[in-house]
Amino acid sequence: MKILFHFTITLFVLSLVACNQIKSPEPVKQYAFIGGKEGDKIDTTCFDSLQLSDPFILADEETQMYYLVGSGGSLWKSTNLKMWTGPYQYITVDTTSWIGTAPRIWAPELHKYKDKYYCFVTFTNPKIIVDTVPNRYNVQRRATHILTSDKVAGPYHPISDKNYLPEGWSTLDGSFWEEDGVPYMVFCHEWMQTVNGIINYIQLAPDLSESMGTSTTLFRASDAPWPREMKSIGELTFGMAQEGYVADGPFLFRTGTGRLGMLWSSWNNNRCAQGVAYSKSDKLAGPWVQCNTPLISNNSGHGMLFRTFDGKLLMCLHHQSLDSENPGPRKPTLFEVDISGDEIKILEKYHP
């Protein structure tokens, strides 16, 4: 009888241990396309008719095709820069993650790196508040994530679930840069949270799946002499006059003399403007010296550079009318530029 009793107790204990060792099932990931408009009619239109903020063009040698992306999450493609086919959906995410089912999609970049394609893109979930700054909007969850695909047109999906930057930071406009074989992300710590917008960088893992260490500040928006404080020029952000300096859209390049430069944007008397800074050390770590005046003004900015298949170097950026009553949408525009010397120079507007 004692043996049976001890045997029963032993079985009971073992069953408890087994139960404790059984892990709760992990939530099932649900991947879906986001951005763009599902069901949009695929059509062909001329470049001058496109409406897009934060445009970025990848000239893909393998397919001999140009791929245009921008805020909103749609992709367009072209063989000649003049006529574009789209819009296509190309971004997929786990909708059970913090990104959610309907995030805002800002400033994507497409890059080919080590035989794979990557999309650096900023997501915002307005339902998640990460910080509160007095006299400003609540700070929403906003962060750049890195997606990957075997094909340039996608679909792109997150490399991992890891956060590249602190959850409590509002970060955006992540841009890819490689220096001495090491990959980095250059990004903005948003002025809506910091008041004075900051451009930072952080090292990435070799496969871009995570960040390494902590980020480093390169400069602040007010370090340049040309940006204007937003409230002082009567600029409204989401309908509210807020003090601060904008830092936006970093993009790095190297001149013909090996000088390291950075395109970045802020606001001046003519609203959005395209600025330039140069690294004194010609290394990402800087220090960075700001040009005294914008490269392009008149409500244009968030520029990037790419080379056409026939060798022209072009800058693509968005432009919007200065008409205060009816400015219309932002539209991508192109300029031919020269970086063969020590600095970037605008040659002329480029018409495909």
Positions of PLM-derived features:
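Carbohydrate-active catalytic/glycan-binding domains of CAZyme proteins
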Residues: 19-352
